[in-house]
């Protein structure tokens, strides 16, 4: 096929394939992501007062993942039925929620890595660091991310329909934007939203690895460093597996949708690659609970059989006690 071949419908042959990938991926993610993140919130709530090691950031990361997971049934419906009957408002909100989840996940993964790194490298300086500061950092992060991600739905339109079919998600048409402005926005977004966070996580990983090379480390200190390194490495792994492919394919996909790339073969390859990258970007919703389990001792302890049994009994006794007290209290007229 000639390189300068222009497609009238470059995605026509790949639409069913891409829809199938999305539907299968989101179905696979849905149940593990829902159960895993609900369990994560329950566990973190239980030991929130016991530790200062980034638990507030982990709670916010689990909330971000849970919001994404709760929108998956609507995405699955669309990709199975090839139509969106729920109105443009809900479509744009779910589309917007995808990016909020992604960049909130990136933000809180960075916060977790930096917090563990600081506790490791400067234990006395940050030993008495109060959780309220982590709460303020989390609130500020949510506000910035929610405002910044408004740009994504603003660059799409929900007015286009094909016959009786209403488009949503990846099929939303892109608004006409000047190419120079698009390049500037994408460059700023890539640098702030991915490159800088990735460099921060890689720096924390590198410095933690160097700290393990001390000639005479104390046994307790060595154990703390190994646990911190495990957590930071898993954060870096999520970045590279889930978010790197998307941030590489996103500018290319934008150029395809803006008709700046004319080669039919190149357009089809980019659309398929971007579809796979989108699926990988959603995978973090069920990967994060696995990370908590394998990199956090408290998480494993809390989910152990005995601790789980004791916690359920404690919650049951608390519920019965509160219910009994409320029924014995006379009603006020």
From Swiss-Prot:
GO biological process: G protein-coupled receptor signaling pathway; negative regulation of interleukin-2 production; T cell homeostasis
InterPro entries in alphabetical order: GPCR_Rhodpsn, GPCR_Rhodpsn_7TM, GPR174_7tmA
Cytoplasmic-side segments: 49-53, 113-134, 204-231, 291-333
Domain of life the protein comes from: Eukaryota
GO molecular function: bioactive lipid receptor activity; G protein-coupled receptor activity
Membrane topology of the entry: Multi-pass membrane protein
Documented effect of changing residue 98 to A: Substantially reduced receptor activity
Keywords: Cell membrane, Disulfide bond, G-protein coupled receptor, Glycoprotein, Membrane, Receptor, Transducer, Transmembrane, Transmembrane helix
Role according to the record: G-protein-coupled receptor of lysophosphatidylserine (LysoPS) that plays different roles in immune response. Plays a negative role in regulatory T-cell accumulation and homeostasis. Under inflammatory conditions where LysoPS production increases, contributes to the down-regulation of regulatory T-cell activity to favor effector response. Mediates the suppression of IL-2 production in activated T-lymphocytes leading to inhibition of growth, proliferation and differentiation of T-cells.
Full protein name: Probable G-protein coupled receptor 174
Species of provenance: Homo sapiens
Gene: GPR174
